[in-house]
């Protein structure tokens, strides 16, 4: 990374001071604004948030800094995707680094773990990866306690609504599929998602579940599982996979399972998916918050991607959705601070953050939007409030806010396209060529 950043590292076990590169731009008369990153150092998702933040900070520093010419100093702390380490990391950023603002790439459980400490420190914080509705419910139910918290990934509720729409519009209506087997990993995430898929997507779309298969994440031979599914003769397989996703995917292609597959495959959102599967990822589709791989992008986001790919040569070579969220989230937070006169007093910053509205246009139409639901503001389709969540739009034709969900599909030639919703689709939802129509 460029040496305009000062980076401190927190390991999973304890805090160690590794290095400090002094930038003469940090003058005594203008102390730096300290932004802290909290997330996993060793995961593709954690690196995506960190890199998105780094690029935004580099751009802002190159333009002369913020708040009257102060440079931004970035410090970071590793959660190791562990709740206890995440709490320690949040404490470290506040007590040792004295941060002004925190950008988070934490997973759900970790964010929920450090939120009580956030409420004590009163530190402005933006989450970019988690979609936990319970985090936004904390803001809604105890606003004064949690008002410093914002999330620019749509919540589970918004994602779920679009899951249902995809089931009705594509799986049931377009494909005319009426039966499914749910193939679910044996994890807490898998179990919770299964309940939602069965109760909301399949039932609402009028699709009958013929079987429910739970597999161990360490399974290496999926042929017995796929053979069982073939004997059941469903119209399609709904896969729920967030851990070791490559194995069931590559074996699906290798075995040329004669049944279409869709669902949730977390690995499929990465540019490395094709290489990781040995070129056997064709036919797999997955649901993912935007912006994401496979989408057409607006000009500003395209410029960010080019800068990212020029600067980072190791994985992830293409930012995950939270990398984009971190990039634009830094701009949101800094813009609010400029109008508020800083990140303190907290109330002034929160008010201006609630007024943030960063709109991105493509070919004259609103493409992405980084604004936030205000306290008491009602989302029209659900009739619910989502204070401080990104202002998502779940009402077709999706012309008012941030889309909550994109469905992408990998094809057998190694390309990946967006197939849903219609506004963003640049490809068609298809079945693999070895399956008879």
Label each PLM-derived region with a short phrase:
Residues 99-212, 260-286:
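Extracytoplasmic ligand/sensor domains, especially the bilobed periplasmic-binding protein
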Residues 25-37, 65-73, 170-178:
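Immediate post-signal peptide segment of exported/extracytoplasmic ligand-binding proteins
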Residues 30-32, 45-51, 64-140, 152, ...:
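Beta-alpha junction/loop-to-helix N-cap segments that form part of ligand/metal-binding clefts
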Residues 132, 153-156, 252-328, 338-340, ...:
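Extracellular/periplasmic periplasmic-binding protein-like sensory domains
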Residues 310-320, 334-419:
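Segments of small-molecule ligand-sensing domains
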Residues 1-34, 434-437:
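Short, low-complexity disordered leader/linker segments with a strong preference
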Residues 36-54, 77-84, 106-107, 183-192, ...:
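Extracytoplasmic "Venus flytrap"
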Residues 46-68, 195-202:
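Short, polar/charged alpha-helical segment
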